[in-house]
Amino acid sequence: GSSVIVPVRSTPAGQIQNFTVLPSTSAVQWGTFYQVIGMANAVLKYAPGVIEKDESYYQSQMDSHLTEAYFLRGLSYLYLVRNFREVPLITEPYVDDAMPTDVPKSSEVEILEQIKSDVRAALATDAAKETFNGTWATKGRATKWALYALMAETCLWAEDYEECVTYADYLINSTAPIRPVFMSTPGQWYNIFYPGNSNESIFEIQYDETNYAQGGGSPSKLLPYGSDVTVNTYMYSEPMTIRLINEFYQNQDEVNRTYYGSFAGITYTSYPENGIIWKYSGLGVADREAVRTILDANYIIYRMADVMLMKAEALIRIGGSANWTEALAIINRIRERSELRPRDEVSAENINEA
């Protein structure tokens, strides 16, 4: 069996696993993020000038577009700071050769403050939408809810815990008629991932293989390598697999078919050692095979469970028995939806384990 995830040796994931990362390794390059940042910078700089030249481009449209540009720039920088900590901070578009290309790195603090400034600027326009026309747009474009989620995560990363709670509560306590909501019924979780764009979703990258030939790849597909590995499975952590089985409410057979599954009728009897990760099993499908020919599942950036756990972590970091109790209540809502046993004790010693 295997106690670690074992990627293919020649892939970027394999290079990371084997500590052989090079500057050319695609998984550690930040160019794509700066492409997004560059486009956002161009919108922020030139959109105001378009109004002067195009009478059909209204102020309300421009303000709405600016909120989306602020969000995409902020989200890109948050991913960069989480992965690289210090990166070049660029807020102007590259339009000619006069722009510098050798830009020094900015500090983590500077970048986080820029993200906060972008979110505040977006919200200050009062043009951030709660919904767009069509579910895919509401979940796939930057809404007011997405801005709140981005700010909550940025504040959590910056250790501004009180502000994190504030922005998380803007989502959790909202009474807007159309808003993201936590899906508390255990059987509903499946809809979050398939078909996606669920009520719980806040922002997710849209893929559509059927209509637009778009595919997100298979980020969880890690194949074994080595002559001693003969099973055609995803290698999964044996200790964590056993721990999940022990904590799961449902019986062994239910765990096996909904969590492990099988490929094209191949049956595996040694589940903890050779577990198969199968997200799209659904319910009541003990004899159904899971074969997907396309890889266009949306990539979920934020959903309500994420925001709730952000608030819980912030409350834990703030400290105090009242905050710990509230944090544990939030965590238990997530656990109970996953049909895991709730935790009923809270102390300075165990709160971080909840």
Predicted regions: what they are:
Residues 7-84, 106-110, 119-132, 285-299, ...:
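Conserved, well-structured interaction surfaces
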Residues 184, 341-349:
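Cytochrome P450 fold signature focused on the C-terminal beta-domain
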Residues 1, 8-32, 48, 169-319:
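Elongated scaffold/linker segments in the mid-to-C-terminal portions of large proteins
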Residues 1-21, 41-49, 78-92, 112-136, ...:
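Aromatic-residue-lined binding/catalytic grooves and analogous aromatic/hydrophobic interfacial grooves
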Residues 21, 56-58, 92-99, 136, ...:
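Short linear capping/connector segments at secondary-structure termini
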Residues 86-109:
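Short coil/linker segments at helix-helix boundaries
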Residues 58-67, 133-146, 347-352:
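A glycine-rich, coil/turn loop motif that links secondary-structure elements
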